[in-house]
């Protein structure tokens, strides 16, 4: 962290929250009985795509604190969820934050 200002540190923190939510959103089930992955993915989906209420407010606040436009982030999340074949999704998510 060295020379990072407090603002930059917070921005990294909030960016990491979005990054993790995108990773959760694109998780694949490891077995038929693995409900924790489905629950995690469902929670991430609700966080990205709920457009009213506290969940939507939280999403927008996290995006604002990360310095990212919530509409842009939501559109990106939509695109990775609906991408055919999950092969390069993780790479797209990583590139999104570069």
Regions found by a protein language model. Name each.
Residues 1-98:
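Charged interaction scaffolds used for protein-protein
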